[in-house]
């Protein structure tokens, strides 16, 4: 089949438009039918650009009784009645919320639209009073339970994350507004809310005591995103075209897609998921790139990382944590981990059932190297746009055996770091080296120590294996001696490549590399 005849839903987030234009669709309607059959309120947390808006739009089409839009899909064989319900769809994603007035204005915009259909009582009443009246009138006028769909419920909260007064004001407004859903329960047929994160403690949903949070529940794990099976069954012609353009085999193309965009796990027991945004853009552009990451790191996450003193190396190597450590965000702790996880930069890699501990790590290469490049400007004078170029220079010098140029470039790297970015702590030096070697890992086999008993860094090129040991205010010979005494070279003795030891000392006063020796 000519792939030009197959339409990719690039930029389309409404189910009706996607189906009307004949776009490709990964069929999730069986699980949608299962959820819609119940009457408890649902909440789903997923990263941005992961299909939440399309999911909500699909629920909207289903509850509007739009049987014509579901022809050929799994739900067509499951649903027999196709009843029509009044649907109130609130999307908070489209606006920037700088003041409480902005939030109230957005709520009023939707309330006025609904009042035009179901009538109003008094316009000067509070948003929650008007919302309550609309739900009651929608029920009385149609004789059907009301469906309430809220997309990106937390957008205002995320934009006020580090402004406690504004955050409290948004919470107060939304808590009162969403609280109507409890008092109006007898008029409601179905509730589904989505967002990036779940806020703990003073939750805007505290009145919805029956809220079913399906974010980490196994039966719902694949409701957003694309499994490998779905990728191959839905997009085989696109994969074949991509393989042709990239001059790769079909199998290698799927493997490359898997390394770049797969790996999201929202429970400890399910298939990995591909990021749908990146998948569609790869097929559209016919080249591998960091599509999701290039859409920008959310401002709230940037601000949170700036304010926290979190050792970011923990994220790079993976870390163990209980579910309470990442499932809910607590604003008062300033711990960025839950927000990093829920924003899609970390995912579940493993689960120890005996200890109830999760291992979190980067889901794939797109996120891993995108995040490393994002961190570089916080520790060095290099912009994220320049990181690829600089990493390649470091790699080429080691590939050619020019350790001297490599170390001199590293010296220049440190010398250019502004005073306010630099500290005399060993951790700061370690993080910078850590980031450099990790970024080199895109091009060569580069390992950085994450545990005792290993060299600080090992880089393997075609002809050589380099072992680096770093000392703060130490002696270069001590670093070299440690390489020998700890046996860091032993695993590579029979490798056949040239083995190179590099001892490095830091001068904390000068905030730079003091000496280095190559053996």
Please place each PLM-identified region on the residue numbering:
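Structural motif
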Residues: 147, 464-466, 500
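Phosphate-binding site recognition
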Residues: 1-425, 440
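A short acidic/basic microdomain associated with nuclease active sites
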Residues: 436-450
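Domain-level recognition of nuclease-like catalytic cores that cleave nucleotide substrates
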Residues: 491, 495-519
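Short beta-strand or tight-loop elements
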Residues: 451-455, 497
């Amino acid at each position: 089949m000519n792939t030009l005849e197959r339409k990719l839903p690039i930029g389309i987030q409404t189910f009706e438009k996607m189906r009307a234009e004949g776009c490709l669709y990964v069929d999730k309607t069986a699980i949608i039918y299962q959820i819609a059959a119940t009457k408890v309120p649902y909440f789903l947390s997923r990263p941005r650009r992961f299909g939440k808006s399309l999911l909500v739009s699909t629920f909207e089409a289903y509850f509007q009784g739009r049987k014509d839009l579901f022809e050929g899909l799994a739900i067509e064989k499951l649903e027999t009645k196709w009843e029509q319900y009044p649907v109130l769809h609130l999307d908070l994603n489209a606006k920037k919320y700088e003041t409480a007035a902005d939030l109230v204005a957005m709520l009023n915009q939707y309330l006025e639209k609904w009042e035009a259909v179901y009538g109003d009582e008094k316009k000067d009443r509070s948003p929650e009073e008007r919302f309550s009246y609309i739900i009651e009138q929608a029920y009385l006028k149609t004789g059907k339970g009301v469906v309430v769909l809220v997309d990106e419920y937390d957008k205002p909260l995320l934009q006020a994350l580090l402004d406690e007064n504004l955050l409290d004001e948004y919470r107060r407004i939304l808590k009162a507004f969403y609280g109507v859903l409890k008092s109006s329960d007898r008029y409601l047929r179905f509730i589904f809310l989505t967002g990036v994160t779940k806020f703990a403690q003073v939750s805007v949903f505290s009145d919805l005591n029956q809220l079913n949070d399906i974010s980490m529940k196994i039966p719902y794990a694949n409701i957003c995103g694309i499994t490998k099976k779905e990728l191959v069954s839905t997009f085989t012609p696109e994969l074949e075209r991509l393989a042709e353009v990239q001059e790769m085999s079909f199998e290698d193309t799927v493997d490359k897609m898997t390394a770049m965009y797969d790996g999201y796990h929202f429970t400890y027991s399910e298939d990995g998921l591909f990021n749908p945004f990146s998948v569609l853009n790869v097929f559209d552009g016919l080249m591998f790139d960091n599509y999701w990451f290039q859409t920008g790191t959310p401002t709230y996450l940037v601000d949170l990382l700036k304010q926290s003193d979190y050792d970011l190396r923990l994220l790079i190597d993976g870390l163990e944590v209980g579910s309470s450590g990442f499932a809910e965000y607590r604003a008062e702790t300033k711990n960025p981990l839950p927000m990093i996880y829920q924003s899609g930069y970390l995912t579940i890699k493993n689960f120890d059932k005996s200890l109830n501990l999760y291992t979190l790590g980067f889901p794939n290469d797109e996120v891993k190297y995108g995040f490393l490049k994002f961190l570089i400007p916080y520790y060095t004078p290099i912009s994220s746009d320049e990181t690829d170029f600089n990493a390649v220079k470091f790699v080429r010098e080691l590939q050619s055996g020019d350790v001297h140029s490599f170390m001199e470039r590293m010296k220049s790297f440190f010398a250019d770091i502004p005073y306010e970015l630099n500290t005399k702590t060993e951790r700061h030096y370690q993080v910078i080296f850590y980031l450099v070697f990790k970024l080199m890992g895109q091009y060569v086999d580069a390992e950085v120590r994450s545990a005792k008993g290993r060299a600080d860094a090992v880089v393997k090129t075609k002809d050589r294996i380099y072992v680096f040991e770093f000392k703060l205010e130490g002696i270069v010979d001590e670093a070299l001696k440690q390489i020998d005494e700890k046996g860091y070279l032993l695993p590579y003795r029979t490798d056949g490549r040239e083995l190179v030891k590099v001892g490095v000392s830091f001068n904390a006063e000068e905030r730079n590399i003091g000496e280095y020796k190559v053996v």
